Regions:
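Intracellular innate-immunity NLR/STAND receptor architecture
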Residues: 1-210
Length: 210
């Protein structure tokens, strides 16, 4: 099944969806750098910035991160996610092989529950059901981390994010893929403009695409 966002975003069913705390950023981007930094996520980040939407992210594949302690990164990560109005989670083939990506996801879903943060999952050339049930690349990645004490929280987070209404960009022709990317960028812009200027509550509806 391929999901699309129905716009404009006009209502949200959960009472937790209204964000009452002050936000430093409009959008936090969670992604695996080597998969999408120089295509989908990079394009989305540029498109949002051009519209004046303030984004933030921590690229887990950035070489500069090797010099930082885990505690320092964790503190930076928590502040970035908690200070964001919306999180876009780009789930790609190698996402689950990064413990830092998985930790981001756990924190994002925590903020969804406690702060009403809007979470938009993007399934970038992966099947949502494989994310939900940890199959294929997601299952293989977690198998290599099996002795980690955070395993259950990671599995729960992957299952929960895959159950959210989201956007599935499957493997396909270049023109079709670019069109889906543009449509997603437009819908995120609509969402952010609604939250920032109209102060309306937002709802995302999954639509099945034949």
């Amino acid at each position: 099944m391929t999901f699309q966002f129905q716009g404009p975003f006009s209502s949200f069913s959960s009472s937790n969806s209204i964000i009452t705390h002050r936000c430093t950023y409009d959008v936090f981007l969670s992604f695996r750098g080597k998969d999408t930094r120089y295509n989908f996520t990079g394009d989305l980040d540029n498109a949002l910035h051009k519209k004046g939407i303030n984004t933030t992210f921590i690229d887990v594949d950035d070489d500069d991160l090797e010099t930082k302690r885990d505690e320092e990164l964790s503190e930076t990560l928590v502040k970035a996610i908690e200070g964001s109005r919306t999180s876009v989670v780009v789930l790609s083939r190698n996402y689950a092989s990064s413990t830092r990506c998985l930790d981001q996801l756990v924190k994002i879903l925590e903020c969804k529950q406690t702060k009403g943060q809007v979470v938009l999952p993007v399934f970038w050339k992966v099947d949502p059901s494989d994310v939900r049930h940890q199959r294929k690349s997601f299952g293989k990645a977690l198998a290599q981390l099996e002795d980690n004490t955070k395993m259950q929280s990671w599995k729960t987070a992957l299952k929960n994010v895959a159950n959210l209404s989201g956007w599935h960009i499957a493997r396909g022709k270049g023109q079709e893929s670019r069109k889906l990317k543009r449509n997603f960028e437009t819908n995120v812009l609509d969402l952010e403009m609604s939250c920032i200027f109209d102060k309306t509550v937002v709802k995302i509806h999954p639509l099945k695409q034949d």
